[in-house]
From Swiss-Prot:
SMART domains: Robl_LC7 (SM00960). This is Uncharacterized protein MJ1389. It comes from Methanocaldococcus jannaschii (strain ATCC 43067 / DSM 2661 / JAL-1 / JCM 10045 / NBRC 100440). It comes from the Archaea.
Amino acid sequence: MKATENRKVNEINEILLPLSKNLKNVEGFVIVSKDSLVKVGNIDGEDLEIISRHMAVVMGSSEMLYKRFNDEVEYIEIKGKKHKIILYNLDDFIFAVVGNIKADEIKDKVMELKFKVNNIDGLTAENIIEEIAL
């Protein structure tokens, strides 16, 4: 089981490391299930739980709206005066990036996560962040 967890951590690190190195304006990330259970993230404290709950609500509402048009949500961009939050739809999971970035710049890399996150139950934020400096 430990070898499987390590492999999953390495696969996700391979995707996240280039994102963190190339994008200086990324302040944090979180991967949550659609029912708002945090899987991996580097946002501290209460903010992580609050953000994950809101992410699930926003994504769920958007998916319901898009189904009415026979379409699917790829990502949602929420822009404030100082920050941006981009929510990427990874089927059963949501990947959120907080910072001052353009959604299209990292979309392809983030979408690679869609094939990797479905079995990340053993991952922790500490495992991921060990090799990532966001």
